[in-house]
Each structure stands twice: as C-alpha cells, then as structure tokens.
A protein has these predicted regions:
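N-terminal small/polar loop signature for handling phosphorylated ligands or for N-terminal nucleophile
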Residues: 70-94, 98-114
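Short glycine-rich anion-binding loops that position phosphate/pyrophosphate groups of nucleotides
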Residues: 30-32, 97-100, 123-125
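Intrinsically disordered, low-complexity terminal tails and inter-domain linkers enriched
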Residues: 1-20, 169-170
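Short beta-strand elements in bilobed, periplasmic/extracellular small-molecule ligand-binding domains
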Residues: 51-52, 56-69
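Short, glycine-/small-residue-rich phosphate/pyrophosphate-handling segment
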Residues: 68, 118, 127-171
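Glycine- and acidic-residue-enriched helix-capping/strand-helix junction motifs
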Residues: 35-50
Length: 171
C-alpha cells in the first residue's frame, strides 16, 4: 500500500480576499535558526531563511504580508504576540519549537490577542517522543499543521488566510 501524496488545494489571491493586504506575524521559536544542519533527518535541509523566503513568496501570491521572526527567548516571543494587535497584525502563524510543550505564557499571550493563530511544525510531534505530544499553544489556535516539513509553513499560511477571509466575509 502506498501512502497518498499530501497536497493542499492550490489557493490563490482570487480564491481568498482578506481586505487591505492583511499582515501575518510568523514566529519561529527556539533552535529553529539551526534548521538545515540540526537533525536534517527530522527537520529537513531547508534553512529558516529558505522557509521564510518561500513563505514571503506565498504571502504575495495570496495578497497578504508576512513579518517573519525567530527567537530563542520565550519573553521576546510573548512580547511579539502581545504587541501584534497594536501593530495591525490580522493573524499569527507560529512554530513554538520546544515551547510548544512547556509554555503557558505563549498560550496565554495568543489567547489574549483574540487573533486567529495557526501552529505549525516541520515534523509530526505526535509521531515522536511522548513529551512532544502535548501542545499547550494549540489550545489557543484555530488549527495545527504538522509533519509536512518546510511545507507546513505554507500550508499553515494558506489555512490562516482562509480563516481570515471567512471572518471578513470575503471568501
């Protein structure tokens, strides 16, 4: 038995409209600056810069803007999330890295914004060690995309843009 190739339907700006160039905050958490060299058998060979460049291309195709950031520091991530509404952010795409399994502070920050948030992971945490199977952050998210490697970011963005379009009544 072969496994089906997982692909999302192609989404274009004509399929989804979210108003005046919605701004998406993309946050990548601890150790993700090491992508490309850190456990490539688990996380792939794409660097975070590669992922961000593709995400920006995808965002342009969807008619949105992405502000992609990375930090190893929980407090910085919490500050970015907390500032998001005042900065005109419409939604959040987040790969909390190891904070997925530990950070009630990030969970609370996402909840406090009231913004739609999609959690993304390169690997599938549910297929890994038991301690990786709990996500505190996902409890505040509209969806979770995992296990598609670097494509998880693009798939998460596609989903988030669809959520924003539905909420604006434009889809």
């Amino acid at each position: 038995m072969t496994s089906p190739k997982a692909t999302a339907p192609d989404v274009t700006a004509s399929d989804v409209t979210v108003g005046a160039r919605a701004r998406i905050l993309c946050i990548s958490g601890p150790n993700l600056q090491l992508l490309g060299t850190r456990e490539p058998d688990v996380y792939g060979r794409d660097t975070l810069a590669d992922i961000h460049a593709r995400l920006e291309q995808r965002a342009r195709a969807l008619g949105v803007e992405v502000d992609a950031r990375q930090s190893n520091h929980e407090g910085t991530i919490v500050d970015w999330i907390g500032d998001a509404p005042r900065e005109g952010v419409a939604g959040i795409l987040i790969n909390p890295g190891a904070y997925t399994h530990t950070s009630i502070a990030i969970l609370d920050a996402v909840r406090a914004t009231g913004l739609p948030c999609v959690e993304v992971h390169l690997s599938n945490p549910d297929a890994r060690e038991a301690f990786r199977r709990r996500s505190y952050v996902a409890k505040a998210c509209v969806a979770r995309v995992a296990g598609f490697g670097a494509d998880s970011y693009d798939l998460g963005l596609d989903g988030l843009v669809r959520v924003l379009a539905r909420r604006s009544g434009a889809s």
